[in-house]
């Protein structure tokens, strides 16, 4: 009631609660010795079943059958047509792959499958020998699989030559549907937010780190199992929320198919003409230098065109232009909008107008050069393509965004931007 009266949003409420250490403790679960139960009151850490060959995988699959009922059980509907999901979470398989999900260069260190509290743990080096049997399991049980980040997990699995059809439930997408104004950058952040877990060693269990030594560290495996437990706990908690909000059909009919399409787009990447990009960068660099030289000629000195303080001295002290609006620090603003206004108002002042025109041209072409350079840097050397990441769970409005590189910051208001 207090938070409501103070109009605190979800993020502020979460920060306040965490500051009082009201969250549940989970870090100790990953620090216990291997021969301990390795469980906590808040997370059910699964029992690890190390898979070394196809026979061991077959044995685990056989033991998991009893706990792996079909989501269609006790219902006349096909799994994809169900309106609710929480009632069948106990008969699903949680999947989590540790590794890098970077499009165009993914990697995996370990894959885990958990059913009924027992987790099959497959190191990356083992998977090649069991891939056919593992793929058959994934194909036959996709509508019973629970993941955190279907798109990201698909990239990691693809690095192993594995394919995952649209799963039953995605805790990352579910969290976005339940709280669209909250974005978790990692599994740990999602668990901390939705499960109120205090992760004291969050940096130590960061997602996406690969150990290429080939040795299995018991501490690393305990952290892997902790991640597996987080996925299961998030699934149980968020499934109830999704049912309460009647969003399960939205999750399965819109969000998961979109994730599948985005995964394909990221994996294929965008073909680019590397030579043309290089030529454009060099041309923009020349234009930026020419504009800088012109600006210096009008200024009468080699003023730093990136320095607001030096620009203010030239524009307002030397050239006598009327100052722009003040910033919070007390200085005058020299952003693009303010400079454009000054250029319009300085038409009768040939020196000032020439300087401002050259300055604006320098800024514009320099920005275009930097954008093209970022695209060149993002080209994958293996296939000559750009593999951006499309963010599906960032904007509360539901729009997509792209990062690494950001393809949405390319200006298209002029011919040069459209050429890019």
Where is each model-derived feature located?
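Short active-site loop/helix that positions an aromatic residue
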Residues: 150-161, 172-181, 191, 313-319
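Short glycine-rich phosphate-binding loop at a beta-alpha junction
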Residues: 143-151, 302-304
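Short alpha-helix plus adjacent loop in nuclease-associated cores
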Residues: 168-229
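Short amphipathic alpha-helical segments and helix-helix/interface helices
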Residues: 58-61, 110, 131-139, 154
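A structural signal for short, well-ordered beta-strand segments and their strand-loop junctions
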Residues: 93-96, 145-148, 167-168
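Nucleic-acid-processing active sites and adjacent nucleic-acid-binding tracks
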Residues: 114-147, 270
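Conserved ANL (AMP-binding/adenylate-forming) active-site segment centered on the GW(Y/F)…HTG consensus within
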Residues: 417-420
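Conserved "right-hand" nucleotidyltransferase catalytic core of DNA-directed polymerases
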Residues: 1-124, 182, 210-415
